[in-house]
Amino acid sequence: MINVSPLLTFACAYDIIDHTIRPRIPWRYVAVTVARGYRYVDKTAGQKESEVFMKKVLLLGDSIRMGYQSEVKKLLENEYEVMYPEDNGRFAAYTLWQVNQAFKWNPDIALVHFNNGYWDMNIESPMTEAIHPVKEYQSFLRRIVELCHSCGATVVFATTVPILEAGSANDNTGTMGFIHYSNEWVKEYNAAAIEVMNEMGVVVNDLYTLCMEDERRYKCADLLHLSDEGSRRCAAQVADYIRKYAEGGNFSL
C-alpha cells in the first residue's frame, strides 16, 4: 500500500501500480508539483516508512531512442525516474508535439534528452524533398529547446548516428514509415543541429562519433537501426550524460 504525500498535486487521473504512480495516458508517470521529481511514502508491510524522491528525465526521439530507452531506464533506476512515450518521435515537428504533451502532464521534468534526424531528412515517394529541409529542421529544433527551457528543464541533444552505406529500410516500430538514408545527409543534418544547439547553449551528446568506433557503425542487418550492442553502447553514454547534466540546468531545487 502507498500513501501519497499531501505535498503532491495531481494533474489528471492516476493509478498506483507496483509502487509506481501512473497516469491514464501514454506517459509513464503523472505530473506532480514537488521540485522536479515525485515523492511518496512507502509503507509496504514489513518495511520501515521511507520517503523516495527522484528527478524526472524524459527521453524523446525516433527508433534509435526507442532501441536504447529501456536500458537507460535500467541503468538509472535507482537515480532518476526515466520516462518516455511508447510512440516513435519520428520527425522534429512530431517530437515538438510530444514534448508539449509531456510537460502538459509532467510539468516537473528536470531534463529532456532527445534526438531527431532520420525522419526529417527522409525523402519518401511521392515526395521529392525531405520532410523537413534543413532550415525547417533547425526551426523545429529551436522550438523544442525553447519549450523545454520555458518549462524549466535542461536539454541534451543527441546527434543522429552514422550510416554505413546509403540505402533504405522500413521503420521497425510499427509506423509503416519507409526511411531512405545516406551518411552525407546525416552529416549535413548533424552539422545543422549542432549549430542550433551551440547557439542555444544546449549540450550535445555525440552518438555519431560513438558509433563511428565500430566498423559496422553498430548497425543491424537493415543498416538503419542499431544492433543490440549499439543500443547498449548508446544507452551507457546517454545515462552518463543524464547523470552529469540533470544536476545542472536552469531550474532550482
Regions found by a protein language model. Give the residues of each.
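Extreme N-terminal basic, low-complexity initiation segments
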Residues: 1-9
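Serine-esterase "nucleophile elbow" of acetyl-processing enzymes
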Residues: 41-108, 112, 226, 232
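Alpha-helical cap/lid subdomain in secreted, periplasmic
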Residues: 74-78, 94-253
